[in-house]
Amino acid sequence: MRVLIATDAWRPQINGVVRSLERMVEAAPEFGVTPHMLTPEGFWQVGLPSYPDIRIALATRRHVARRIAEFGPDHIHIATEGPIGWLTRAICLAQKHTFTTSYHTRFPQYVAARWPIPESWSYRFLRRFHGPAAGVMVSTATVEAELRAHGFERILRWGRGVDLSLFHPRPESVLDLPRPIFLSVGRVAVEKNLEAFLSLRLPGSKVVVGDGPARADLQRAFPEAHFLGAREGEDLAAIYASSDVFVFPSLTDTFGIVLLEAAASGLPVAAFPVQGPSDVFAGSEAAVLHEDLRSAALSALRLPREAGLQLAQRHSWHSSAEQFYGHMRRAMQTAAAGKAARVEPAPASTALSVRLEPAEGKEFA
C-alpha cells in the first residue's frame, strides 16, 4: 500500500504532530506500507503570523497535484488543516479519491487564546475540513466525545506511543541544580499555559525545555527559571530522567506525547484535570491531577516512580502504527465495496490520477 501523508507540520518543527508522523513513517515497512510525506519542504514558505518559527507553504493546487501524481498513492491521509491540507483535500474531492484525516490540535481553543474569535466559528471551519473524510483519527475518547458533540462523524481512535529504548530511568543526573527539579517540556507558546507553571511557589528549580514565540517574554518575567531551549534524542531523555517531577500546565492539548515520555523516564507528573492528562493517566498512580497545580506538583514528589514505567509499557509506537494504517486499509476496502455495489468500472489502479499541466514560469517548488 502506497500512502501519501499530507502535513503542514514537519521538520524543523519539534512538536507532537511531527513526532507522531515520524514514528508512523518509521514503522510503515512493518505493515507493508510505502509512505511518502507531502510537506512544506520544496515550496516557498512564510512565517505564520504571531508564530514566525512555524513556516507555512505558499503552494498552488497545480503544484501539490503534481507532487501527488508523481508518487501515485493508493491512499491519502491529511494530517493538518493548513494550506497543504486544504489543497490536498480539494484534489481528493475533485478526483473522488478516498482520504482520511487526523485531529491533532484543539484548534478552536488555540485560536481563542490568541485572537477574539468564537470557538463556534473554528468548529464550523473544522467540520467543513474533516466532513468529507472517510474517517477522522483522534487520540483519545475525550477528544472523540468533544468532536461528536460538535457534529463530527466517522471518528476513529488512533493512540500514541513512546520509545522505551530511549526514554527510561538513568542512574546519573545531567542537571546540576538545586532539588527538587520541576520540569516542563514542549512548545513555548501562549496556548501551552507555561506561566501557570513558572508562577508557582515551589522549592528547588524550575526547568523548561523547548522553544517558541513566548520564550523571550517568559525568560524576562521569570529569570529564576532555567530555559534550556529545544532538545531531542538522548539529550532530552537524560533531562527527563534527571528531574523529579514533570509539570504539564497545558489546558488545550489533545494528548501530550511528553506525558508518556516523562512516565517512561520514571518521572511523576503534575497536571490539571483536563483532556489529555485525564485520558493518559486514567486509573494510574503515575500522576497527580488537581486544579491547584502547586499542590499537584508537591504531591507528585511522593508518587512511586514505578507507576509511570508500568503505564508507559502499555503504549507502543508499533500498536499506534497498526491502528493508523489499519484505518487506512479499511477505508480503502469500504470505498472499493461501495464502487462495486454501484457496478462502476474497476480502475486499473487505485492510485490517484491527476491531470498535469506544464509549469508556466517559476513554480513554487
Stretches found by the model and what they are:
Residues 216-234:
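Nucleotide-activated donor-binding/catalytic signature segment of Leloir-type glycosyltransferases, i.e.
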Residues 268-271:
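Short hydrophobic beta-strand element within catalytic cores of glycosyltransferases
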Residues 302-337, 341-343:
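A charged, aromatic-enriched C-terminal amphipathic alpha-helix characteristic of glycosyltransferases
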Residues 124-170:
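Donor nucleotide-sugar binding/catalytic pocket of nucleotide-sugar-dependent glycosyltransferases
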Residues 251:
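Aromatic "clamp/platform" in nucleotide-sugar-dependent glycosyltransferases that forms part
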Residues 174-207:
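Conserved donor-binding/catalytic core segment of Leloir-type glycosyltransferases
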Residues 130, 230, 238-243:
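Short alpha-helical donor nucleotide-sugar binding micro-motif in glycosyltransferases
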Residues 98-100, 109-128:
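Nucleotide-sugar donor phosphate/pyrophosphate-binding loop at the beta->alpha transition
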